[in-house]
Amino acid sequence: VTGEAAPGDLRAALSAGLVPAMRARDAVTVSALRSALAALGNAEAVPSGDRPRAGAMEEAALGVGAADVPRRELSEDEVRAVVEQEVAERVEAADRLRALGRPADGERPEAEAAVLRGLLDAARRRA
């Protein structure tokens, strides 16, 4: 994946690599990139606080944008940490599958980890 991104901008590299991977029908790369981008989206979520989760309709948030939640801006170090965690989870999954005697099933998470590692390395070189 060779997404053009600003120096050190790992999120931009993840996003930039997604469309070419989809066009190439590279399922492993698409899965790795989508998963990492989703993990970043989750990390940006701000806890909803004291908004009621259920109850009377008059307490419900209604209208355009009512379901939107505030987001926080992740630093480049935080983005890198989230992607590194995604790599670690895939390596762990591959190891578990191999330990269960299913080495072929461990190839996919290992390949996804390699995609993300490559982007992490490229982002470090650009920084």
What is each of the regions a protein language model found here?
Residues V1-A127:
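Charged, compositionally biased, marginally structured helical/coil segments
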